[in-house]
């Protein structure tokens, strides 16, 4: 089962993607589900239930929380709660809900500072930072996994995330970070079992029965790992 774990709709102020266009494009490219990782407060539960009931596709409500240690994708939590801006407090909130946390695009702007600074290492020389040094950042001990494939990242930024995830023994996740139909599904997460609801989705994440993947849009789906593997089927 293929799910894009990182998508923004009009509920995020910086997105131009309507739910209707999202579902249409997701079906066209071969996705089985989409996570709506909205900025801010995300969807009201009742509004989301009405939205999801309109489409023959798995839609997962989620949040992308702006914290003191970068952006964290949160799954299995009802909505925004006070204290989420601090990662350690966010960890407690997510644990209480039985949810799952993924650090999103951890090395964005690490190697090209012309558009801003990296969230985790604002003063570091990205050219000199090793994966082992990067893996020592405390955020990686507070999250459940690392986003290793993000459509808004450069290959080098995603590559460093993959190296860090490997060092930490994490599976890694994939998501497009789409804010329009462009690139939706460019990175996905392949689940070993079918998922029919949020509860099952979080259960599969916590069990580690998933693999980040790329190549769906080119018709050559393959695991997003540091080694060479045969294409997923």
Please report, for each region that a protein language model flagged, where it lies by residue.
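Short, conserved beta-strand segments within well-ordered enzyme catalytic domains
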Residues: 35, 58-60
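Short, ordered loop/turn segments at secondary-structure junctions
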Residues: 39, 64, 106, 178
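Ordered, amphipathic secondary-structure segments that act as subunit-interaction surfaces
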Residues: 87-88, 104-105
């Amino acid at each position: 089962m293929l799910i894009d774990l990182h998508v923004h709709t009009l509920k995020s102020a910086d997105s131009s993607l309507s739910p209707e266009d999202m579902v249409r494009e997701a079906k066209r490219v071969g996705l089985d589900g989409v996570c709506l990782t909205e900025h801010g407060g995300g969807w009201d539960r009742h509004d989301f239930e009405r939205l999801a009931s309109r489409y023959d596709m798995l839609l997962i409500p989620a949040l992308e929380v702006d914290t003191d240690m970068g952006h964290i994708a949160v799954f299995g939590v009802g909505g925004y709660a006070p204290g989420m801006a601090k990662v350690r407090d966010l960890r407690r909130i997510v644990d209480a809900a039985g949810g799952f946390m993924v650090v999103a695009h951890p090395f964005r702007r690490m190697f090209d500072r012309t558009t801003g600074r990296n969230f985790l290492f604002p003063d570091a020389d990205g050219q000199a930072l090793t994966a082992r040094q990067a893996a020592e950042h405390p955020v990686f001990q507070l999250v459940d996994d690392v986003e290793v494939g993000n459509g808004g990242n450069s290959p080098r930024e995603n590559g460093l995330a993959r190296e860090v995830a490997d060092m930490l023994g994490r599976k890694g996740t994939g998501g497009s970070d789409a804010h329009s139909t462009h690139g939706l599904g460019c990175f996905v997460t392949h689940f070993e079992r079918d998922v029919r609801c949020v509860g099952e989705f979080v259960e599969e994440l916590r069990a580690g029965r998933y693999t980040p993947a790329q190549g769906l849009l080119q018709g050559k789906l393959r695991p997003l790992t540091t080694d060479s593997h045969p294409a997923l089927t």
